[in-house]
């Protein structure tokens, strides 16, 4: 018989099905690891490529493997080494070859050309300094690589003595700065934090011509200050490193992010001027959990030309989006989380007004750079709050400002995209003409916000095509097009939009990763699964889509939309055949499958249509090979059987074969692929709230045919029919069981006993009939020997 559902073991069949599911249903991995529902691109700010790393993310830390800026994700430049070599080149006045310099500094100074160079200038101090640093580096590397047995531990006291002596000999600021840095570092690593701070103040501050090395030393001072509890000064010092040090800015941010969770306001007293104050507020503004609006307000007041201002504002907009919009997978939240989310949404709704007020003020502030950012941000927040006229007004102002910022250009385009779909009362050719070019430009979106915009705009316009006045926050579990007439249609919308349902469907297809992603960028979390939508779409909808593709007089929009989706006749008619099979319209299924190229049935997907669709075995793994049918010939056979049964309702053999064929296209059948793209043993469960009351899962249609066949005068055929009906009951029970959960006060044993009562009372009628009335048939005896479920049932009796 067909196997009982196994959810924790992989049988031969489940391995095969898993392979199909992976092949057909899984797209490439998510392109962005921290996606959320957002439409405002932070790239629209004037932040430098280096600062773009600090765009808002829901995560606590950034992905350090992506490089310093999003514009250079593959940049693996060792900034520390680069800075250092440039400094040494300047110190040597360019009189030694770069490769010799690098070997002497990052290899070994002993017997190197760099050593000879320094000797020629009587610079023994430089040689001694490099010998010390290279030995320290060698030991540190060995310890990190767990090679401690092969090296001697450094003696901090001895190192401090050596560095102090070297410092006394230093006359040039270049070497003095480096030796002082090593001294501060050694004190800090030895946990002599007060001495580290003192060494910095005594030796680094007096250096007139400071380089990046002073900022490296400042990092060590700040770390020591944290250990001493001086968080305010440490925060200030980290902010200076963040602004000035190309190589250590990320480290400064991470340590402050991890060690100082709140902004110490006392840090402001260490700032020497307005620029430093603004930089301090910027450093605070990029931290999670910090209210950035007061920070950016201060920055505008103190230093309106600061390049972090727009970035901080973009962060606040993105942060508020995170709380304002329903985020992906919100349906899995528990009740307590839902309450928290609701409160956050209420706060975010109020916060939009504050952000918008500040943004509009900045749009009119002549002291700020005229980039178009503030007009664009104001337009977006007017859109969020539903004032589309004002949004258009601000967006037009933004368009009038010349910019070379591609991120800002894309944001303006994105907002225009949203506005077209949202503000349009009805669908007209003019609306379609305006919508299409932007839709085409967002094809294969390059970031998740573009993907979100495609989803939102297509969803809104799709709803209007269907005559739905409002857009639901979540789709029905039956799919967007499983019932296109479940709401009262707006005749004005439909009257102005020929092929409205077909257009709505195709727009939905553009929200899927199969149709709107690429190998380069992968798919996004907001994108839908085309196969799941197709598997829940009505036959009537697909017929409308085919009629739309067959239209002779196509508009530019029609041609463009159909080209973007890219469906050919094979795809459309295969889908129509599947949906007809799902609705047991075998004549239309045959009609559709006949129009599919025979080569399609030879593709990898259809190699799994390899078991006889008109045969139901009594024992698992006793399936017959499919030697006679492809989808077209099988659908044709089913249509013929149905016609014979209609002509003669007493034709039990036709009823039985029709029942077998119908059963095999259900969830537990061997030919489910004639209805669905994919199959999973975990598809039915209690947590995803799927739509399981369909014939695909409940097998009602097959059971009806089996019962009709059971009226045969042939006892063996009748026994077969009742066994088939019993399988339908069993499958329905499995679906019911897998949706249930134990009550809080129930043990697993009590829960299973309760479920067993349900099975016995509601889902075992036909096993009972087979046992009580047909136990003398050969077929019943065969079933008793071979069918595990029936044997269990008999054991209970």
Residue ranges and their predicted role:
Residues 1-11:
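N-terminal secretory signal peptides that target proteins for export/translocation
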Residues 14-25:
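Bacterial N-terminal signal peptides
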Residues 12-15, 714:
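Generic alpha-helix initiation/capping and coil-helix boundary signal
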């Amino acid at each position: 018989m067909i196997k009982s559902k196994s959810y924790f073991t992989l049988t031969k069949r489940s391995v095969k099905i898993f392979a199909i599911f992976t092949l057909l249903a899984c797209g490439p991995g998510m392109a962005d690891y921290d996606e959320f529902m957002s439409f405002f691109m932070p790239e629209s700010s004037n932040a430098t490529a280096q600062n773009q790393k600090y765009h808002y993310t829901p995560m606590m830390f950034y992905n350090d493997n992506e490089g310093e800026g999003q514009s250079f994700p593959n940049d693996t430049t060792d900034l520390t080494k680069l800075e250092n070599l440039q400094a040494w080149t300047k110190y040597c006045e360019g009189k030694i070859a770069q490769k010799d310099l690098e070997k002497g500094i990052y290899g070994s100074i002993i017997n190197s050309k760099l050593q000879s160079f320094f000797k020629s200038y009587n610079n023994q101090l430089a040689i001694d300094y490099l010998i010390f640093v290279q030995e320290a580096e060698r030991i540190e590397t060995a310890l990190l690589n767990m090679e401690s047995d092969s090296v001697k531990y450094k003696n901090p006291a001895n190192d401090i003595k050596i560095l102090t002596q070297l410092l006394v000999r230093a006359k040039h600021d270049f070497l003095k700065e480096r030796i002082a840095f090593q001294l501060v570092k050694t004190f800090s690593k030895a946990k002599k934090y007060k001495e580290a701070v003192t060494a910095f103040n005594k030796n680094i501050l007096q250096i007139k011509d400071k380089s990046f090395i002073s900022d490296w030393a400042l990092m060590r001072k700040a770390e020591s200050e944290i250990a001493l509890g001086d968080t305010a000064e440490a925060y200030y010092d980290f902010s200076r490193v963040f602004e000035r040090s190309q190589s250590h800015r990320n480290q400064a941010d991470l340590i402050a992010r991890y060690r100082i969770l709140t902004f110490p306001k006392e840090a402001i007293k260490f700032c020497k001027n307005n620029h430093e104050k603004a930089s301090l507020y910027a450093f605070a503004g990029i931290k999670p959990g910090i209210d950035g609006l007061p920070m950016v307000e201060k920055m505008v007041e103190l230093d309106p030309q600061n390049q972090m201002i727009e970035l901080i504002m973009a962060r606040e907009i993105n942060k508020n989006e995170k709380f304002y919009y329903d985020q992906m997978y919100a349906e899995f939240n528990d009740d307590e989380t839902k309450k928290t989310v609701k409160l956050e949404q209420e706060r975010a709704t109020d916060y939009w007004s504050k952000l918008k007020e500040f943004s509009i003020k900045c749009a009119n502030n002549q002291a700020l750079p005229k980039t178009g950012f503030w007009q664009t941000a104001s337009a977006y927040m007017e859109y969020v709050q539903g004032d589309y006229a004002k949004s258009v007004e601000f967006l037009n102002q933004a368009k009038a400002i010349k910019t070379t910022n591609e991120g800002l250009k894309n944001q303006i385009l994105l907002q225009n995209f949203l506005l077209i779909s949202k503000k349009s009362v009805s669908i007209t050719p003019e609306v379609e003409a305006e919508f299409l070019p932007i839709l085409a430009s967002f094809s294969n979106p390059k970031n998740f916000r573009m993907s979100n915009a495609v989803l939102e705009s297509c969803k809104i316009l799709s709803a209007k095509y269907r005559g739905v006045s409002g857009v639901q926050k979540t789709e029905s579990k039956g799919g967007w097009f499983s019932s296109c007439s479940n709401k009262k249609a707006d005749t004005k919308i439909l009257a102005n939009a020929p092929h409205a349902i077909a257009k709505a469907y195709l727009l939905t297809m553009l929200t899927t990763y199969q149709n709107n992603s690429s190998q380069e960028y992968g798919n996004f979390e907001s994108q839908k699964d085309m196969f799941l939508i197709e598997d829940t779409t009505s036959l009537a909808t697909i017929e409308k889509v085919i009629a739309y593709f067959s239209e002779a007089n196509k508009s530019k929009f029609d041609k463009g939309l159909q080209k973007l989706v890219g469906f050919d006749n094979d795809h459309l008619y295969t889908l129509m055949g599947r949906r007809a099979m799902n609705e047991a319209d075998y004549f239309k299924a045959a009609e559709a499958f006949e129009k599919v190229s025979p080569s399609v049935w030879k593709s990898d997907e259809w190699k799994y249509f390899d078991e006889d669709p008109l045969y139901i075995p009594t024992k698992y793994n006793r399936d017959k090979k499919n030697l006679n049918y492809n989808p077209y010939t099988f659908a044709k056979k089913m249509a013929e059987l149905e016609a014979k049964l209609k002509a003669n309702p007493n034709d039990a053999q036709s009823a039985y074969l029709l029942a077998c064929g119908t059963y095999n296209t259900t969830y537990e059948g061997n030919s489910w692929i004639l209805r669905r793209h994919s199959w999973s043993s975990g598809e039915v469960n209690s947590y995803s709230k799927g739509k399981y009351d369909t014939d695909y899962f409940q097998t009602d249609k097959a059971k009806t045919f089996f019962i009709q066949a059971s009226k045969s005068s042939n006892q063996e055929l009748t026994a077969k029919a009742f066994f088939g009906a019993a399988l339908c009951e069993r499958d329905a029970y499995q679906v019911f069981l897998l949706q249930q959960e134990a009550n809080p006060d129930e043990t697993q044993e009590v829960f299973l006993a309760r479920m067993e009562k349900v099975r016995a009372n509601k889902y075992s009628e036909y096993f009972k009939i087979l046992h009580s009335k047909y136990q003398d048939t050969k077929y019943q005896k065969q079933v008793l020997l071979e069918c595990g479920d029936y044997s269990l049932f008999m054991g209970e009796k």
